[in-house]
């Protein structure tokens, strides 16, 4: 918040563009609204950014609630998942995703997903991988940032746990291929914009 206040009050910036992270963006949202500073393309899909609508907040990333519903529908309808688990970051980002997944399951008369959380500061995910394995879930959805998401995939692979794995678009970073190792094979994730360096795409 202090850094954004400096940008607005001392550097007199016209707008804030592409601020990274749910907690960071929510932390400065009210201040930017009160000061009529345009908040463009915040890097978060939290519904709290857009609901209620704010005149100077322009969110482009897919809403985590919508994303959670779509991932659940795909897991059940396309992959034939019978029992779901969710590995999620224990903050607004992960909690919104988990709530959406469970809402879709409830709508279908199904049991809630097995919820396995991690904290943003965690660096070892062996315990979470074991919890996911012992849950008996045949499908796991990740609402995680790249390093923890890729790391838990690697840990699951180490212990021979190979469920169908889907993930929020937040995980989409080239680093996950090295971090996750061979366990990355078969990962399904969504996207809300084409790669900016794909010169074969006429939209780019």
Predicted regions and their residues:
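Beta-alpha junction/loop-to-helix N-cap segments that form part of ligand/metal-binding clefts
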Residues: 1-48, 118-125, 145-150
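Generic structural marker for isolated residues within well-ordered, non-membrane alpha-helices
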Residues: 4, 72, 173
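Solvent-exposed polar/charged
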Residues: 9, 30-33, 77, 134, ...
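Structured helix-beta-strand junction loops
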Residues: 10, 35, 108, 135-136, ...
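Structural recognition of the beta-strand scaffold that forms the well-ordered cores
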Residues: 14-19, 37-43, 58-59, 83-88, ...
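Extracellular/periplasmic Venus flytrap/periplasmic-binding protein
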Residues: 46-50, 55-160, 178, 197-203
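Extracytoplasmic/periplasmic substrate-binding proteins
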Residues: 152-166, 170-187
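Early exported N-terminus immediately downstream of N-terminal targeting peptides
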Residues: 192-194
